[in-house]
């Protein structure tokens, strides 16, 4: 299954490691360092120029990518639940 992260960006749900609230988690020095390193290494994709609300960490073929999205983590998690629910039909 796939998860729409905003604009025209979709990722396979099987590649998602975590969905995080950017406002709450960026208070941590470790998280800020992680995001800065990911940006420095070219592993960050900004989904939209709008104010970011979440970041999504994905691993595909042993490559980590961090997506910055304007969609709230709660909405993204609901979408993954909806997709998982469809699989049970």
Segments (PLM) and residue ranges:
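Eukaryotic intrinsically disordered, low-complexity regulatory linkers and tails enriched in Ser/Thr/Pro
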Residues: 1-89
């Amino acid at each position: 299954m796939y998860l729409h992260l905003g604009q025209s960006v979709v990722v396979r749900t099987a590649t998602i490691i975590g969905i995080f609230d950017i406002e709450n988690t960026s208070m941590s020095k470790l998280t800020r360092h992680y995001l800065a390193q990911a940006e420095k290494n070219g592993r960050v994709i900004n989904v939209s120029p709008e104010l970011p609300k979440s970041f999504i960490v994905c691993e595909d073929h042993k490559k980590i990518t961090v997506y910055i999205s304007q969609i709230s983590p709660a909405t993204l998690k609901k979408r993954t639940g909806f997709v998982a629910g469809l699989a049970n039909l």
